[in-house]
């Protein structure tokens, strides 16, 4: 049962509130809390000069600022602390604050708790953004007033009073956001699971545990959608508290969605033929099947079909850039894990020239090497993980007794130049890093945009 937002308004008024992080996504939250009558202090590691005009803007509305390297040392004495998702709750500063009586939460937890609209939550290792967007587009096509947020779109908590019971909200949720969650969306999906973010999570078990929070607090009339082709997610059916629908690319599924004789079906009803889908790759057929399961109760087959046959994809996801001298360039900068890169490689009909490497999330690259060695013509590596990926591939090349040229480069510009020089007419060059971007870029979008700019200048 959803709580009325008036309870939160009564609770937060006059409270001493700390908001950790003054990034773009937290700024609407800070301003909203001030509007609700809270006494807000905003914390950030950056100094005033780095933050720019936002520091003055916040001070003008009465927000106190705690800035600099040791900013978390001053979390004592607050009634409520809104933490940024990527910060672990077991940090000593948070543990101490909680022991002193602080209520530690996050924007997303409070949003799901009080949102009057029906909430669709999507998580998983790969396919989250595309599936979130597909669900959003299908609901919108059906005529619902639909909001999208979480890891994509805009922060929604500040707009909660505009939302109605007959609205729909679609959220992409990361393991970081879910780790401390004690509330679940009414309709939840786990797309798939593979090792990821092990630079933040203690181990893979903790990562999986965090993902399960998306359905752990559901009720009997809620829905959980699971991937039947993924052993980990398929086995979660036994832990479900409500209804379960499954999707599969390889098995017939009657209580869910599947690919049968090249037809995409939901509950035995045909939606469309796979040849009519604009999205590239089998992994995107899986994303569509998952979306069908989520919206089945609310959306007509016609609306599902329209989106499935017209939606051409989200930027930075197997995105075709251009063809130059018979060479095709694709931007798959979203691929920040080996499994996502492997899915991208599988969407091409021939071996490609792959540009990969980046920030080290402490995840193994052996599965990428073993599953992808025969799908790569030339491997161009950059970033912190370049030698780690090279080592994984060299082992596979050695015992498979196959050949693959591996080139180490120091920049995106050099990577594209090398790829372009080595490519022949008919080749495909794709940026699909298998790693996060943080060693060289603030995010995957900026990484992808630089790649596109370089390719477009060829």
UniProtKB/Swiss-Prot annotation:
Pathway(s) served: Cell wall biogenesis; peptidoglycan biosynthesis
Keywords: ATP-binding, Cell cycle, Cell division, Cell shape, Cell wall biogenesis/degradation, Cytoplasm, Ligase, Nucleotide-binding, Peptidoglycan synthesis
Annotated residues for binding of ATP: 124-130
GO cellular component labels: cytoplasm
Localization per record: Cytoplasm
GO biological process, one term: cell wall organization
One annotated GO molecular function: ATP binding
Domain of life where this protein originates: Bacteria
UniProt family annotation: Belongs to the MurCDEF family.
Protein purpose: Cell wall formation. Catalyzes the addition of glutamate to the nucleotide precursor UDP-N-acetylmuramoyl-L-alanine (UMA).
Record's protein name: UDP-N-acetylmuramoylalanine--D-glutamate ligase
Source species: Clostridium botulinum (strain Hall / ATCC 3502 / NCTC 13319 / Type A)
Gene: murD
